[in-house]
């Protein structure tokens, strides 16, 4: 008999060799009917999996995230099945579930057309209606390679697997695919699916590899859920920062400038400047000192820091090591520069903590397939910072960093959109990370203890750390469901040693400090993208590039309009006036489309009484208000950063 610890805390005994499904059925027939997959010892698995030892087990139903992922993963295989039926010469790559659905990558001579997607969707529905059996089986490596001999991408994936790894397959009807699972027991419960679009994607995300065709889609148990999703997709398209940011003249791009190099237009630049001044002032209030460091450095500096060994492919290198006496590189991070500043003078324990802050322009050689609008770029501006602390100060300073980030998030109104990820190293990937298992384990244990003390609700993720230490990443999803890191806090165990950083403790002994890397508001470009999508371009007044627009009803009142502009501009308000000889209704509509928080209409009555007729985004037409009263209200709204 084996012991199975269930999610409710109970422990039950079962015969060894039962499947997860059989265990679910023994607990409840209803649970078995609704079961989609399981989680055994923290790892998602198939209901078909056999249990042969003591384990912890959670049964995941269709409405759980794990269940939704299993449904969509299964339907990605149905898509591949349909492709093989209709386009049998197509070669298969990979087909995972993603946050809002699934995709599958194909190698096909001619890209799929919109009509092809319609045919494939119809064929998928036909396959589901056939209700084919779904089987899982495993094969030794040689038999697996033989089975997949006509699928070059599958052969490559099999060869990438370690010698001891299990090679498993799923067979849906007459279609077999290499896959670790999990998959649903039957396609019958899946009542709604949609293929949403196709796009290009490099094999394994590497632009040196062949460009494949990626088909995206989604699936649900109910048509009503699909309808809701499709409505959300339409709303997401309206909010997409790539579309809206251009419409609102916040940024643009140009192929002559280059991919991943967005140009912030005056309005976008004003938002970033407002954020930057706010962050720098807030950091100064919290004891940060400002640095200003070069945009590039000799390769020698990056060799000390480890970037040359672990991050060189992500850097823009100026020169040739074999030909040039000196080789430079644009900086991907600020840390080695601020450490050099620290080493410019001796430090006592009384000097610590030192909190360095800098608004840094950084450069990273992102692959063309990774770049997206303002979210993934090759040049960006980071609210960077490094705290040099004693071991005793580490937890309190880490807490202080989090409090700063949480204050900024709450003010921006994005605190409820954030999730926390504890990013750890992969001990098998020594090319990516500094290879010091003892230091990694100690530092990760330290960070985990701090996070638990602070009661942070986080998930753990392997192979997501920085090369020099673990991270707490604050993750935010864009309108399309893709998750990106917005802010990060890292504990560095390596670079103090590499840069020979030290302080003199109270006993007069030389000690190594701890280092906390952090970004208080992240990359300004990425944060701007998230804010565009969060507010659909209708930013809070304090953040809006134009806070007030004055509209005279005719040119007779231009002088009064100009006096209103001067009065408010002298008080720091970002204000414009529209003096065009257009109908007032047209000018109001235009100002609304620009998401202007306040529109002030002025005519004879307003000029005579020193008033403005206010139209606000929140309350629409508010009527005439004394200019002084409106000014007081507006300045208070800006000062308090009201949303």
UniProtKB/Swiss-Prot annotation:
Its cofactor is Zn(2+). Its EC number is 6.1.1.3. SUPFAM superfamilies: Class II aaRS ABD-related, Class II aaRS and biotin synthetases, TGS-like, ThrRS/AlaRS common domain. Its main location: cytoplasm. It catalyses: tRNA(Thr) + L-threonine + ATP = L-threonyl-tRNA(Thr) + AMP + diphosphate + H(+). One of its GO terms (molecular function) is transferase activity. Residues 240-540 are annotated as: Catalytic. One of its GO terms (cellular component) is cytoplasm. Catalyzes the attachment of threonine to tRNA(Thr) in a two-step reaction: L-threonine is first activated by ATP to form Thr-AMP and then transferred to the acceptor end of tRNA(Thr). Also edits incorrectly charged L-seryl-tRNA(Thr). Belongs to the class-II aminoacyl-tRNA synthetase family. PANTHER family: THREONINE--TRNA LIGASE 1, THREONINE-TRNA LIGASE. This is Threonine--tRNA ligase. It comes from Clostridium botulinum (strain Alaska E43 / Type E3).
